[in-house]
Amino acid sequence: MIGNRLCAFALLSASAIIISAQPASAAKFDGTWSMTAVTTRGHCGTIPIGMGVAGGRIYSTGGSFAFYSISLGGRVSNSGSVSLKAVAGPRVAHGTGRFSRVRGSGTWKGRGPSGLCSGVWSATRS
């Protein structure tokens, strides 16, 4: 019984360390970025967004859409693969793409004030 508890504790401790440890290579994308989302389908326009990356996590540093502040969230993998979510009031968009050391690009889709929109995004390190 004690052996099972000790084994379970060791497994949980190791899992917590693995989950919380951020690989050093993900830090190569850390910093501030200037992002632009361009609509290619629908009526959402061109949207400039301030973006930051810390430890592989994406967050917003500025920008608005339809009079709402934009909140960004998402991840950048060690290889530069990006998945992100943007929320501006009741509007939500999801995007995917890829980062290199100084720029990134991808696609997005979501809902604007007048219906569904989709397009491309690009980002450069500030």
What are these regions (language model features)?
Residues A27-S126:
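Central antiparallel beta-sheet cores of small beta-barrel/beta-sandwich binding domains
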Residues F9-I18:
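Bacterial N-terminal signal peptides
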Residues M1, A26-A27:
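Absolute protein N-terminus
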Residues M1-A10:
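Bacterial N-terminal signal peptides that target proteins for export
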Residues L6, A24, W121:
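A broad, low-specificity signal marking well-ordered, structured residues that form hydrophobic/aromatic
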Residues I19-A26:
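Sec/Tat signal peptide C-region and signal peptidase I cleavage site
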